[in-house]
Amino acid sequence: MYLKASALLMAALSIVCAGLAQKSGDSEAPSWAPKPVEIPKYVPPHKPVTRLADLKKQHAGKANWSQVIVDDNTLHGEYIQSAPGTSTPRRFHPDTREFWAVVEGQLRVNIEGQAPFVATRGSLVQVPVQTIYSIETIGDKPALRYEVNIAHAKTFYPMEEKPPEIPGFQWLKTQLNRKPGAYDRGNQPHVNLFELAKDPKFRGKPFMIDDRSFANIIYGYERELPPLDPKNRGHYHPECAESWLVMLGQIRYPIEGQGVIIASEGDVVYVPMFTFHAPRYHGEGAACRLAMNGYPNIAHVRDAFLPD
């Protein structure tokens, strides 16, 4: 009887210890992970941070302008300003899902299968594969959006539209068994950050989940974070770069080889693959960043046994 009781006690202790190990985060055995000896370099058009204020100065006096911010082998992102009364042609992407964030102004969005809606500051909009859509700028001020798609994504147009000229290409009348994509996996046509933030418990959520791209709303307050640890260099991603659009407040970015960057609303921060970074909310008020990369479950590789 004594031996049986002892065995049961030891088994119970083993379960408790295992639970404590899992909570401490030390239950995962360390792995050898490759990392280049030299810190990856930034290749144009990429910069550690693209300031919205600088873009506005660069394009001052223009009602319509665009500038590519991200153009790597995973994603393509660009800022687009459009004047009131202008609109895109009706179009669709044959194999990719597109999304954009409205930074300023008002956009009337028409998406096949959805009721038209108006997107404003804080709005995030996405259009699934093979789904026809158009964007119209309304109101009395230009609208500014940050638009993202898969690298080298192609654009098709319905027959009633006149496609733009593309050097080296011709336009053919084609069919592709087009089927508008679904809003599955929790994807939605439109959300607005400020509507979401009316819930005091809101601290972010994935906005766009696709096989080859991912956009995550990360929202909160610096006061809710653990104390800043300058020795914690965060994590890196071994398969692709990552970028963020600051949607509200300020975000602090220690980036390997670049020092500390404080990014504000409208700024875009970019970190190449294999580069350590440790973003966190900064300042007294609420802050939000939209994290964008090419993998729905991207690996966050950190130094073993250090909190991230």
Predicted stretch roles:
Residues S6-V16:
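Bacterial N-terminal signal peptides
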Residues S123, V129-F156, M273-H300:
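Ligand-binding loop in jelly-roll beta-barrel domains
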Residues E78, E98, A115, S123, ...:
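Short, conserved secondary-structure segments in the cores of folded domains
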Residues G113-V129, G257-M273:
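Short acidic-glycine-tyrosine-enriched beta hairpin
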Residues S66-I69, Y79, T88-P94, I111, ...:
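Short histidine-centered beta-strand/loop micro-motifs
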Residues Q22-H76, P89-R90, T155-P227, R233, ...:
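A short, N-terminal "cap"/entry segment at the start of jelly-roll beta-barrel domains
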Residues Q81-A83, H93-V109, E222-E224, Y236-Y253:
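Short, conserved beta-strand element in jelly-roll/cupin
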Residues M1-Y2:
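N-terminal secretory signal peptides that target proteins for export/translocation
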